[in-house]
UniProtKB/Swiss-Prot annotation:
GO molecular-function term, one example from the UniProt record: ribulose-bisphosphate carboxylase activity
Catalytic reaction(s) noted: 5-methylsulfanyl-2,3-dioxopentyl phosphate = 2-hydroxy-5-methylsulfanyl-3-oxopent-1-enyl phosphate
Quaternary organization: Homodimer.
Pathway: Amino-acid biosynthesis; L-methionine biosynthesis via salvage pathway; L-methionine from S-methyl-5-thio-alpha-D-ribose 1-phosphate: step 3/6
Protein name (Swiss-Prot/TrEMBL): 2,3-diketo-5-methylthiopentyl-1-phosphate enolase
Record-linked HAMAP family: Salvage_MtnW
Gene3D superfamilies: Ribulose bisphosphate carboxylase, large subunit, C-terminal domain, RuBisCO large subunit, N-terminal domain
Family membership: Belongs to the RuBisCO large chain family. Type IV subfamily.
Organism: Bacillus pumilus (strain SAFR-032)
Amino acid sequence: MSELLATYVLTHREDEQVNRKAEQIALGLTVGSWTDLPQLKKEQLQKHKGRVEKVTEKFAPAENGLYQSEVTIAYPEANFSADIPAVLSTIFGKLSLDGKVKLVDIQFSDRFKKSLPGPVFGIDGIRKKTGVFDRPLLMSIFKGVIGRDMTDLKEQLRLQALGGVDFIKDDEILFESPLAPFEDRIKEGKKILKETYEETGHRTLYAVHLTGRTFELRDRARKAAELGADALLFNVFAYGLDVMQSLAEDPDIRLPIMAHPAVSGALTSSPEYGFSHSLLLGKLNRYAGADLSLFPSPYGSVALPKKDAFGIYEACVKEDSVQKTFPVPSAGIHPGMVPVLMKDFGLDHVINAGGGIHGHPRGAIGGGKAFRSIIDAVIHGESIQEKTASCQDLKAALELWGRVVE
């Protein structure tokens, strides 16, 4: 019998019976009561009964004299259909209302994984699209675009591309606007990036923000593909993982999907309830089809604890039956962080910068060149001091922001 394993962290009083609570969860989310059932009913329902797989009691103290224990429960896959909404409703539906239970991991069976597409492109496919195989990718972000028209957006796009970035993404709060319509951003963006490629020989891809009502998204994404869009930025947690999966599975779309973590903080930030960062921004994003997953880095302006950030990274890149998702540590990234980013996340991640590019004293071109310069220095084992002597853009960036050293 195929089973799904769900692991929870329970926050509780020292004298609370954790094993009993685990049994209540296993039964309450499957067959309900058990001891009061007649034998015939038990035989009929046995294949639907949840069971406690493992309990690790009091592995960590919590605040206010409370403790935390870890519980793993096995759920028969016969209980739910092969989709993420059914899984989450079963293993964490009403249980999420408890307030002292955090879902930290899900282990899917090989049979169930066949219903989850994973990334269409993944790390390997994205690298083929960019033509970059030997370093982290560099991404920049449109900034201050609310209320601006296409003239301003085109100029921002051009300057960022001339700085040598590999990706440029829309701001996640840029929605459909008569000043900068979705389709115009794609068409005009393609023209600008074609021009910069012809000028520099460097290819930059543009991730346009897919927005609108849920039932409009598929048609808009298909239109984006028809117009030759490079990739889609998607606020997955405003819409739902299943919506992203449906976009990833559509053969008429076939565009890389960049999953933004907006809204996820409401689901992950508490140590006592919600989801773990690694599960939501890592594993579930990956299984639902995210080619790139953005998350706060451990060093920037909205820093995650290292354990959580590295947990997301591992969930994105560990070997599995689906392709790997490109991890994108973000928020407050500047050139002085690059050596630490590359030490901690290796080559297979995307360095994502907004203010670290636009806030450069020489503008977005200087910001991009500063990032590219320090990335190259780390790749080739050059000293940062020597590199700053030969690159004024990097020197200006480090004078402004300094270096993060561990």
